Amino acid sequence: MSGSSSPKCTPKSLPTSGQKSLHDIKHPLSCSPGAEDDAAAAGENGAVIIDSPSPDLPHTEPSSIADKDLSLPNGTPADTSSPASSSSLLNRLQLDDDLDGETRDLFVTVDDPKKHVCTMETYITYSVSTKTTRTEFDLPEYSVRRRYQDFDWLRNKLEETQPTHFIPPLPEKFVVKGVVDRFSEEFVETRRKALDKFLKRIADHPVLSFNEHFNVFLTAKDLNSHKKQGVTLLSKMGESVRYVTSGYKLRNRPAEFATVTDYLDTFALKLGTIDRIAQRIIKEEVEYLMELREYGPVYSTWSGLEKELNEPLEGVSACVGNCCTALEELTEDMSEDFMPVIREYILYSESMKTVLKKRDQVQAEYEAKSEAAALKREERSTVPTDVEKCQDKVECFNADLKADMDRWQNNKRQDFRQLLMGVADKNIQYYEKCLTAWESIIPLLQDKQEPK
């Protein structure tokens, strides 16, 4: 089944270096179910508040580069495999994801971005492919096209109908015109990855994945008819709670949730600092890259004037060129893989703090009604029904938030472990390539004898 919620326009395929199409993954009904690269972390029962511990990584045997054994400052042998095989650590790190994927029953992938040019607007749509064995779906496979505003609609609906859960963030909608080209291949691919991660987080959630709006988003041929529905009753009730408790100061906030809020404030602050510094590093690397591109050809031009030094100078020029290529790859990886994860978790922390404020509002409503009931306790012997309902809401909120916090901490540990392993892997490759380039011209320089 296929569908689109956007006006009919002429789509144009955009190049993408994204993941494999979902059609290349075996269906869960087959003998060997496919596994997603971004499966949610499971198993570890982390505490609600942690100092971001680093799980043990797989042990690897040290290898050598140019017959030299390297070691870390603490004496631990370092893995110095060649660039062609230096990603083996990441491959082993993802084994847990693959095994976890075998137990899943809902697979969602965002790919195949296309540009639509209409009279009034130009926009990008993405293919959202679904494979599932769940009985809530009429068919085992779906494929629909969605644009960014459709993802935004889904997230708003999840916030309205699942107020006690952390909703994954979407990538920023607005970009600065003239600074970022929102139709460029790089921007579209970065957004595609973020949207894919957004849907995968929802699909992996034991509650959000069963939300009716998520089902509609994945399957509806015409999403516009569903988007036109009015504000839900639950949303209106939420507004009423905020109005009733706007002047009430919370008295007995659980210490664990106060600690969570403090942790998220510090976490977002640290990530914000990393984000700003990383942007400066990327800027400096780009400037350095531009200088290198001018630096290398100078030796090549010089070699034409020096017959005796022709080969060594050409070698240095080629070496600088190889270093340029390696640095360009390192910078692109930092921009396209490292930065989006940092920004996602900054947005995630802000979203989580919003949910915690909603929890406080529900507790404030409960405390206000409890105090009002206590003043009338002489007139009635039983606790009013509305007070009991408020108490149930608070307990439900607390239970859901604790479960989601544990899940978020597990996902965060896995995401940052993979992120930092990727950073280490890319830096190893960069320095290996530079080392190989410079070592390759040493024999050329040594063989060049001084003229007699």
Curated annotation (Swiss-Prot):
Sequence ranges assigned to domain PX in this UniProt record: 104-225
GO molecular function, one term: phosphatidylinositol binding
Keyword presence, Protein transport: yes
Parts forming coiled coils: none
Organism: Xenopus laevis
SUPFAM superfamilies, A to Z: BAR/IMD domain-like, PX domain
Composition bias, Polar residues: 1-20
Domain of life: Eukaryota
Biological role: May be involved in several stages of intracellular trafficking.
Residue numbers spanned by region Disordered: 1-90
GO biological process terms held by the UniProt record: endocytic recycling; mitophagy; piecemeal microautophagy of the nucleus; protein transport; reticulophagy
Protein's name according to its UniProt entry: Sorting nexin-30
Biased composition (Low complexity): 76-90
Family: Belongs to the sorting nexin family.
Keywords: Protein transport, Transport
A cellular-component GO term for this protein: early endosome
Pfam families registered for this protein in UniProt: BAR (PF03114), PX (PF00787)
